[in-house]
Amino acid sequence: EKGIVCDYFGIDINPGMIAAAKEKFPENKDKFFVFDILEEQMTETFDYVISVGPLNLKFETDQNMDFTMRLMKEMVRLTIVGAAISMTSSFTRRPNEETFYYNPAVVLSETAKFCTNIKIDHTYLPHDFTIFCYKRNLYNFIR
């Protein structure tokens, strides 16, 4: 749509999500896989690894933050340039019981334990934010 050319590879632990992706993008159906990156070892690397919205539902036990940080660490391991995860923000004005809300300051603090080149964007929706973790210093990367 915007003329951006990329080679896309999609994974999800939910077979229904993979089936929906294959149906929506039949020309790329061979690039969508059911896979759990926290349980299975992935050997491929990617320029960017992006996760959008999978961490918004509350777990039955209070493990959202632990799971999220394990996922982010693994995403960073698989990336060459950087990783990004979008999350629901604790700064929302309309919380509900089913959603887990992440405090951006806590996510930043936890991410800083394994990534020093971090950016948070909390400007695009009132209840979401994305944390970006880059492998290299952004100042040197842009130059």
What residues fall within each predicted segment?
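Class I SAM-dependent methyltransferase SAM/SAH-binding core
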Residues: 1-40
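Short, conserved SAM-binding segment of the class I
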Residues: 67-78
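Short conserved loop adjoining the S-adenosyl-L-methionine
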Residues: 39-44, 59
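Conserved beta-strand signature within the Rossmann-like core of class I S-adenosyl-L-methionine
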Residues: 78-89
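Short alpha-helix
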Residues: 98-118
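Core SAM-dependent methyltransferase catalytic element
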Residues: 120-143
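A short SAM/SAH-binding and catalytic strip from SAM-dependent methyltransferases
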Residues: 47-65
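Short "lid" loop at the C-terminus of a central beta-strand within the Rossmann-like core
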Residues: 55-56, 88-93
